Amino acid sequence: MLKAVILIGGPQKGTRFRPLSFEVPKPLFPVAGVPMVQHHIEACSKVPNLKEILLIGFYQPNEALNSFLLKAQQEFKVAIRYLQEYSALGTGGGIYHFRDQILSGGPQAFFVMNADVCSEFPLVSMLDFHKQHGGSQSYVILGTTANRTQSLNYGCIVANRDTQEVLHYVEKPGTFVSDIINCGIYLFSPSIFQHIAEVFQQNQQELQLEENSSWQRMEVIRLEQDVFSTLAGRGKLYVYKTEGCWSQIKSAGSAIYASRLYLSQYGTTHPERLASTKEGGPTIRGNVYIHPTANVDPSAVLGPNVSIGMGVTVAAGVRIRESIILHGAVLQDHSCVLNTIVGWDSMVGRWARVEGTPSDPNPNDPYSKIDSETLFRDGKLTPSITILGCNVSIPAEVVILNSIVLPHKELSRSFKNQIIL
């Protein structure tokens, strides 16, 4: 029997995802038409003998989360539960805190994945690899290749070329260590908890030496820095390298890139989700997802990489490319939306142009990853995708370029390279 744990974080995390995370917990943000974490759940449901999925985070349980879990259980026919941490305990602290729930029923192994990654999730291949490399006494990290410069932004893995054993692990090193990076998806045997317990006891001893220490800090354990670095070179930790697409979803801009990766996967996994040009329907270019309840005028041109949410209205002559249009938004006649996320119930006026700058990886480098740009560079806003928060109104015939508009704003003129508070 197998289980899966998905680490979904909490409201204090994912701040780079604002203003989109104001309205909905980041793991429920729609990427390629379905909530981000649903891609993980679907991948888990395809693993034979996987009986339960546990979501661990420190969001307060709310209606959106509860109804999503209920729908997902019915759709994927697998038990799904949410376990709430009392505070942010780190990637290792969360699973250690809920170790009894994870181990109940006696799973032989369990997956642990971060909710903010986009991947093909080669879980069955990881399972086969795990059986060949030590089984119950070994642990597997999913790895991929990055270029030398960008590898410094991730956990770097030095592995034995023949056996794939992890010899050395460094989280975000200061200088180049390895071009194999950690994808944030793991397969553990239950014995991993012995190693996490060692870190817990070590934290306990260190805190006893400090006078004003808080007991909560004892439970804050990071898998990457505290556990993997000590397990490396001990014959227990292995890396399974994937050639498939992979990306982090840290900033709102990376959601558009992740949407592109998932839409391209739909060609083989869910062809029914992709729209096509039909007589009397809109012109579709490339991969496009349109929710069945959306109302799209036949003269509109959509794609590539466009995701249209529930109840969206796309009027005559509208052009949309490389964008996510969320629930209830209205795009009026002849508006143009490029490299933009249009928030829930927002309105783009007639002949208005809303455009951003894509933050894509370098297309000439096969190992390039998406850069997590800082919001400001040299005192100026870094050009990135345009984001309209929830319930934003853009008047007719204006241009909004490389800007972030916070929720409930009614704009009256054009803006360029600004954050509109």
Swiss-Prot record:
Keywords annotated in UniProt: GTP-binding, Nucleotide-binding, Nucleotidyltransferase, Transferase
Signal peptide span: none
EC number: 2.7.7.13
Keyword Cell inner membrane found: no
Domain of life according to the entry: Eukaryota
Tagged with keyword Transferase: yes
First-tier enzyme category under EC: transferase
Pathway(s) served: Nucleotide-sugar biosynthesis; GDP-alpha-D-mannose biosynthesis; GDP-alpha-D-mannose from alpha-D-mannose 1-phosphate (GTP route): step 1/1
Known catalytic reactions: alpha-D-mannose 1-phosphate + GTP + H(+) = GDP-alpha-D-mannose + diphosphate
Single biological process term from Gene Ontology: GDP-mannose biosynthetic process
GO cellular component: cytoplasm
Pfam families: GMPPB_C, NTP_transferase
Entry GO MF terms: GTP binding; mannose-1-phosphate guanylyltransferase (GTP) activity
Similarity annotation: Belongs to the transferase hexapeptide repeat family.
Name of the protein this chain belongs to: Mannose-1-phosphate guanyltransferase alpha-A
Lineage, uppermost ranks: Eukaryota, Metazoa, Chordata, Craniata, Vertebrata
